């Protein structure tokens, strides 16, 4: 379980904006920003905050979370339940939410889910014809396997036909990794050649690519060069040497 903090829906994950018939000052905060369950801890607790001044109703939905071709895939599940499924928060109010595991953890690999918190439309106000933003926030739920859970990363770099540089990451471990950012430097250089912001998750057994466009003022190194990669992740800082292939 990582650091506890509050995220605002306006800056958080999976923000959904929908137009209806009223202006709202409500927004959603959640603490902590993820839940980690296991055979020893089958229930996790989250606190949902209404950081605005207007009352708001929230509906919870848990989805199985997988990835395919670098994209998130969500499917319905009953393996994790969130309770209460629907609740109303006054302005400035909070609600304790519990996420409970309803199956045995996998013996070898981490299981991954997401809890979606959807703000529900309020009763219509016939006296106002403005717009309302409905917040939708998503946060991850990780279920640890019986074995030790650890991401194992393989980085690759290749020049593309248009001169860009494609950085590829494959996670061959049995647990996720979240890449917060990474930088690439030439050996002996005091300054990074480029820094890439990310915040991307790569689940176990999955891959992700980043394409860094060609820049005449700062062109990618040629094939055969070795880049020094430094990444900040939710598992700590990591370094790797990456060979650029044609």
Model region roles, listed by residue range:
Residues 1-11:
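Bacterial N-terminal signal peptides that target proteins for export
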Residues 10-19:
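Bacterial N-terminal signal peptides
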Residues 48-52, 168-173:
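Asparagine-centered strand-capping/turn motif at beta-strand->loop junctions
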Residues 103-144, 148, 217-246:
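Terminal connector regions
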């Amino acid at each position: 379980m990582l650091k506890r903090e509050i995220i605002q829906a306006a800056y958080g994950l999976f923000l959904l904006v929908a137009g209806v018939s009223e202006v709202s000052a409500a927004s959603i905060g959640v603490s902590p920003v993820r839940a980690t369950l296991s055979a020893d801890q089958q229930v996790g607790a989250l606190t949902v905050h209404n950081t605005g001044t207007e009352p708001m109703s929230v509906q919870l939905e848990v989805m199985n979370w997988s990835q395919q071709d670098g994209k998130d895939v969500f499917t319905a599940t009953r393996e994790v339940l969130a309770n209460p499924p629907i609740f109303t928060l006054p302005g400035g109010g909070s609600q304790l939410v519990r996420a409970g595991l309803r199956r045995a953890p996998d013996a070898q690999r981490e299981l991954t889910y997401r809890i979606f918190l959807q703000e529900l439309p309020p009763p219509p106000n016939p006296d106002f014809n403005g717009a309302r933003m409905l917040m939708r926030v998503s946060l991850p739920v990780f279920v640890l396997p019986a074995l030790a859970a650890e991401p194992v990363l393989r980085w690759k770099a290749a020049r593309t036909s248009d001169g860009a540089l494609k950085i590829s990451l494959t996670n061959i471990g049995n647990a996720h990794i979240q890449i917060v950012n990474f930088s690439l430097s030439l050996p002996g250089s005091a300054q990074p050649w480029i820094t890439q912001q990310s915040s991307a998750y790569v689940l176990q057994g999955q891959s992700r690519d980043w394409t860094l466009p060609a820049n005449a003022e700062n062109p990618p190194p040629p094939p055969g060069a070795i880049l020094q990669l430094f990444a900040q992740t939710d598992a700590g800082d990591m370094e790797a040497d990456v060979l650029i292939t044609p």
